[in-house]
A protein has these predicted regions:
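Carbohydrate-binding surfaces of carbohydrate-active enzymes
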Residues: 165-183, 190-199, 205, 210-224, ...
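Aromatic-lined ligand-binding clefts that engage carbohydrates, nucleic acids, or primary amines
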Residues: 523-525, 529-552, 580, 642, ...
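Aromatic-lined substrate-binding rim segments of carbohydrate-active enzymes
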Residues: 64-137, 221-226
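Aromatic- and acidic-residue-enriched segments that line the glycan-binding/catalytic groove
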Residues: 93-102, 116, 127-157, 209-213, ...
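Aromatic- and glycine-enriched glycan-recognition loops and surfaces
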Residues: 55-73, 94-115, 215-216, 530-534, ...
Length: 735
């Protein structure tokens, strides 16, 4: 035991020495707000920040007051929100210096209500990338109009490219003055305000060199300070910030995100890691898992198995590790109204949160309320408590235990029962230096957690959190609805039709985040042209479907792929004027991968020759090869190492959903074979060609999307090559 303690003291000394070597933190108004390695100090008082994520843009303003009231009721002292650029600047400005399209009225009203009416501090996260399962990850769709022809990163957005930074400055110059007016340092003593502003978001998941990320962060910090931001700036899951000695970046601090599901003990170890990596700032969890989002075709968040035990355990284990700031993400999820959710996201953003989408409360709300009660009682003491070493009896293999001690000697013993089925009920003996051994009887249900508070002053001990009773609220059951009559109403296609130039996207004409738009054209054809043309081919800005009507009749899609916007119109055309109407369905803007950078709408369309039905080629074999392909025939004759895959629509859709949800890393046929590394993958398949297919010219093969370079071989002969990112690839294989 003595040897162990000696080792720990040496480690602590080295830990403190490392902290002293880092640049000292500078604060604009340290008497109003500052922080050290332990906690935030606001107006001279150490504070444990317990925050609730609540997005003002996901709930009608008429319901804000109800949600704030319940947040306050649960014991929170802070609320956090993302601030989406595309929500506040929906229409493309004339230039980078034009801020006339920005509207911050709802943000200002939300901040005012939080600060003045409910006495809550606020944390704001303006991105520009926010993720949040939100359209474009917060970027306006019109920003894609300014995408440079060349850039050396996987994405243009989020990068250090001058064009991106120019528009990032535009956004910060617009929104930061709003923050500046509402920050704590501009308020009277005792009033509430913004206490933190985040730069970027989860930068660890963006593929760019650290030096370039640091360049971005330095510029963003300057955009904030130049616009009057005086409260602390922070990042989220950005390793470049932790322990930085850079003059600017060292003045930021990084927070952790914790989505550990039922591995709740990791909440403790992750905080301990954060404190080692960043010894001069408080250990804060920016996103303490409050549930999970739902995707189209998957389960709903409200059916989540992450119950009150999970919400309670996440908080207590983070505290056991030394966290003095927790933000439940989400505490209230809300709704993706009017198509604002990212592609594949459901309208519901309930998130399985403690405060339901409808505003209802449950046992999970009661569990979080118990955490809030505990923080309100002991938060100030916990804020400067220290982890202490201890040993116990050997009967705790299914428990994760942490012990913290205040300067006054009060002990906090945190316990989590990792067993999924069996409750722990037994005496545990604790040995702590300078104290006589003592026994604690622990009764903890499976996957549940508790904290024992032992007061040094009076020798009393008590378990927390206390069980909370939910207030009785009136329940109005919905009245039954019976459909007595239904009528059909055909679209008349009357409206404000506008001329459209080829290659002009919807955002460029002021159409933003609208689910459906209509295109209309009248084409005059001769009798000869009617006999020649039989297809309508539409090129889109992004992978969205069209639905086409020609002369009042629905045109069938040429393939089973609903995103292949080629239509068979043979028999629908006639001599003279032909009316073609297309309904464009906006499936939503992606929120973190390449389509995030694409405009929306139809780019171009044209009539094509008649063609027979498209035959999907779904079954393939694939394998990775070490070197460039030189002898294709010998390579194909080797039947070892090939894996059969399906490139059908349902498989790809399901894999994409898994990838977005982050539930597992799927064996994505095109993207994961090389596992993100340079190399060569070979795909092979067999096609049974009939004489009829050859005579009718059914010899065009189209790949909807090929990334990087590719070469097509048919019967051992090279017939075509491709060298582009994320673009279709069409070749004639008749030769």
């Amino acid at each position: 035991m003595n040897k162990l303690i000696t080792l720990i003291l040496v480690c602590c000394f080295a830990f403190n020495l490392y902290a002293e070597q880092l640049p000292a933190k500078q604060f604009s108004h340290p008497e109003r707000i500052r922080y050290d390695q332990h906690c935030f100090t606001i107006e001279g008082r150490d504070i444990f920040i317990l925050s609730a994520a609540f997005h003002y843009f996901r709930v009608p303003q008429e319901l804000w007051r109800d949600r704030f009231r319940k947040i306050k009721e649960a014991g929170f002292n802070t609320v956090e929100t993302y601030v989406p650029w595309n929500w506040h600047e929906r229409t493309m400005p004339r230039n980078v210096k034009d801020y006339s399209q920005c509207d911050f009225d709802d943000l200002k009203a939300w901040l005012k209500m939080a600060h003045e009416e409910f006495g809550l501090y606020t944390i704001v996260r303006p991105g520009p990338f926010i993720c949040a399962e939100w359209a474009g990850g917060g970027y306006p769709r019109w920003v894609a109009k300014f995408c440079p022809a060349k850039y050396d990163t996987s994405f243009w957005l989020r990068s250090n490219h001058p064009e991106h930074m120019k528009w990032t400055k535009h956004w910060y110059d617009a929104v930061c003055p709003v923050f500046a007016e509402e920050q704590l340092t501009r308020k009277k003593s005792g009033e509430k305000g913004i206490i933190m502003v985040q730069l970027e978001n989860e930068y660890i998941y963006f593929g760019m060199e650290s030096e370039k990320k640091e360049e971005v962060l330095r510029d963003m910090a300057a955009y904030c300070t130049n616009n009057g931001i005086e409260v602390p700036l922070f990042t989220c899951v950005t390793p470049e910030v932790r322990g930085s000695k850079d003059a600017v970046i060292s003045q930021l601090f990084d927070m952790d995100n914790q989505y550990v599901w039922w591995n709740i003990q990791e909440a403790k170890s992750r905080i301990e890691d954060l404190k080692r990596q960043q010894p001069n700032a408080p250990a804060f969890v920016c996103e303490l898992q409050g549930g999970w989002f739902s995707t189209v075709g998957g389960g709903l968040s409200e059916d989540s198995y992450l119950d009150g035990r999970h919400a309670r355990g996440m908080a207590l284990m983070a505290m056991a590790g030394g966290s003095t700031g927790l933000n439940y993400y989400m505490f209230f999820g809300g709704t993706n109204l009017a198509g604002w959710g990212a592609r594949r996201m459901t309208t519901s953003y309930d998130y399985g949160a403690a405060l339901k989408e409808s505003g209802g409360v449950s046992e999970k709300f009661a569990a979080v309320k118990g955490v809030g009660d505990f923080v309100n009682r002991f938060g100030t003491q916990l804020a400067r408590s220290e982890a202490i070493e201890f040993t116990t009896s050997d009967n705790i293999k299914d428990l994760t235990v942490g012990v913290r001690r205040t300067k006054e000697g009060t002990l906090f013993i945190f316990i989590f029962n990792k067993d999924k089925k069996k409750a722990f009920r037994d005496n545990v003996q604790f040995h702590i230096k300078g104290m006589p051994a003592f026994n604690v009887y622990c009764s903890v249900e499976p996957l549940d957690s508790k904290v024992l508070v032992l007061s040094q002053a009076n020798g009393q001990c008590e378990w927390y959190p206390k069980e909370q009773t939910l207030p009785e609220r009136p329940v109005n059951m919905p009245m039954p609805i019976r459909i007595a009559q239904a009528e059909r109403c055909d679209e008349t296609f009357q409206g404000n039709w506008r001329p459209l130039r080829k290659g002009v996207s919807l955002p460029e004409i002021g159409v933003n985040d609208c689910r459906y738009s209509m295109y209309r054209s009248v084409v005059k054809l001769s009798k000869k042209e009617v006999e020649e043309y039989g297809t309508l081919v539409c090129e889109m800005f992004t992978a969205d479907p069209l639905y086409v009507q020609v002369n009042g009749k629905i045109a069938k899609r040429a393939s089973t792929d609903e995103l292949d916007n080629t239509f068979v119109i043979d028999g629908l055309l006639h001599e003279g004027n032909n009316e073609i109407v297309s309904i464009y369905e906006n499936r939503g803007q992606a929120h973190g991968y390449r389509p995030m950078e694409e405009l929306s709408g139809m780019k171009s369309a044209g009539l094509g020759k008649k063609q027979s039905a498209i035959l999907p080629i779904e079954k393939w074999e694939v394998k990775k090869v070490e070197n460039n392909v030189k002898d294709i025939k010998s390579l194909l004759s080797n039947n070892e190492g090939w894996e059969t895959i399906m490139l059908d629509q349902s498989t790809i859709a399901n894999l994409a959903t898994l990838q977005i949800a982050g539930l597992e890393k799927p064996e994505w046929p095109a993207a994961w074979v090389l596992q993100g590394k340079e190399g060569t993958a070979i795909y092979r398949t067999s096609i049974d060609m009939t004489r009829q297919m050859l005579t009718e010219g059914q010899t065009m093969i189209e790949f909807a999307c090929v990334d990087d370079a590719g070469t097509l071989f048919v019967n051992g002969k090279e017939v075509a090559s491709h060298d582009a990112w994320d673009k279709p690839f069409v070749a004639n294989i008749s030769a």
